[in-house]
Amino acid sequence: MVALVQRVSEAAVEIDGAPVGAIEHGLLILLGVHEDDTRTESAWCAEKCARLRVFPDADGKMDESLLDTGGDALVVPQFTLYGDTSVGNRPSFTEAAPPDRADRLYEHFVRELEGHLGQDVPTGEFGAMMDVRLTNDGPVTLWVERRADE
């Protein structure tokens, strides 16, 4: 499982021009599910995202997490994170989990993250074409990955 995590001052997702989720200060998490992922990887990634110390403390040092700041998270599914561009010019998505499994693990990730944060987490919609807007803060962007064989 991979989470592309971006510290944002605001982020929002729309489907067909209608807003479906938005946050202010927090993390935008683009989530990709690998074909070998299980609930173990999902739970690990959710906890890691909740505990990532990427927000500045009183001294300006990146040392606080969403749990410390009370910030929000917005989670958007993105199977293209598993796009393989090593051969040719058209990405292959064979490493991405099939949609039914990916959707279940995506929902599991969201529930786990909500449990850690103690609040509802707005999300994009699995399988939908979405417009995502964000204002990076920093910018701070991290690649958080956990493979089933680790």
From Swiss-Prot:
Top-rank EC class of the record's enzyme: hydrolase
MF (Gene Ontology): D-tyrosyl-tRNA(Tyr) deacylase activity; Gly-tRNA(Ala) deacylase activity; Ser(Gly)-tRNA(Ala) hydrolase activity; tRNA binding
GO cellular component term of the entry, any: cytoplasm
Keywords: Cytoplasm, Hydrolase, RNA-binding, tRNA-binding
Domain of life: Bacteria
Intervals of motif Gly-cisPro motif, important for rejection of L-amino acids: 138-139
Major localisation: cytoplasm
Catalytic reactions on record: glycyl-tRNA(Ala) + H2O = tRNA(Ala) + glycine + H(+); a D-aminoacyl-tRNA + H2O = a tRNA + a D-alpha-amino acid + H(+)
Signal peptide: none
Keyword RNA-binding: yes
Entry's localization field: Cytoplasm
Assigned EC number: 3.1.1.96
Biological process, per Gene Ontology: D-amino acid catabolic process
PANTHER family xrefs: D-AMINOACYL-TRNA DEACYLASE 1 (PTHR10472:SF5), D-TYROSYL-TRNA TYR DEACYLASE (PTHR10472)
Function of the protein: An aminoacyl-tRNA editing enzyme that deacylates mischarged D-aminoacyl-tRNAs. Also deacylates mischarged glycyl-tRNA(Ala), protecting cells against glycine mischarging by AlaRS. Acts via tRNA-based rather than protein-based catalysis; rejects L-amino acids rather than detecting D-amino acids in the active site. By recycling D-aminoacyl-tRNA to D-amino acids and free tRNA molecules, this enzyme counteracts the toxicity associated with the formation of D-aminoacyl-tRNA entities in vivo and helps enforce protein L-homochirality.
NCBIfam families referenced in this protein's UniProt entry, alphabetically: D-aminoacyl-tRNA deacylase
Family per record: Belongs to the DTD family.
UniProt-recorded name of the protein: D-aminoacyl-tRNA deacylase
Species annotation: Salinibacter ruber (strain DSM 13855 / M31)
Lineage, broadest ranks: Bacteria, Pseudomonadati, Rhodothermota, Rhodothermia, Rhodothermales
